[in-house]
Curated annotation (Swiss-Prot):
Organism superkingdom: Viruses
EGF-like domain span: 41-81
Disulphide linkage map: 45-58, 53-69, 71-80
Gene Ontology CC annotation, any one: extracellular space
Protein name per Swiss-Prot or TrEMBL: Pro-variola growth factor
Length: 140
């Protein structure tokens, strides 16, 4: 039953803000006061809730027996204490060139290592098989 009143309040605030400002969804304190007079179960918190909401307006719902915050644009949380951060990395297309930069470097290092190993193997193999004395190598 209390959610019904809260939904009715927010629907009235949104409709009223669209009617007054065209496309902006911003609610002033006077709009909430005018809306809550129609619904006696929901009212502004008063002096006990002045500092309850950090970035928003405090509303007291009788059925819930507690305070509820209507956050200003750009804030979220139970007491409107968190700033809504926009993640720009997800909105942009990922840069594919930076993801391929390590690949050629790794391939180049592997290729050079294989070539060096092959040259060392050939050098040692030919050195062992060709251990001939120096006088035999001299051509007459």
């Amino acid at each position: 039953m209390s959610m019904k009143y809260l939904m009715l309040l927010f629907a009235a605030m949104i409709i009223r803000s669209f009617a007054n400002s065209g496309n902006a969804i911003e609610t002033t304190l006077s709009e909430i006061t005018n809306t809550t007079t129609d619904i006696p179960a929901i009212r502004l918190c008063g002096p006990e809730g002045d500092r309850y909401c950090f970035h928003g307006i405090c509303i007291h719902a009788r059925d819930i027996d507690g305070m509820y915050c209507r956050c200003s644009h750009g804030y979220t949380g139970i007491r409107c204490q968190h700033v809504v951060l926009v993640d720009y990395q997800r909105s942009e297309k990922p840069n594919t060139t930076t993801s391929y930069i390590p690949s050629p470097g790794i391939v180049l290092v592997l290729l050079v290592s294989i070539i060096v190993c092959c040259l060392l193997f050939v050098y040692r193999f030919t050195r062992r098989t060709n251990k001939l004395p120096l006088q035999d190598m001299v051509v007459p």
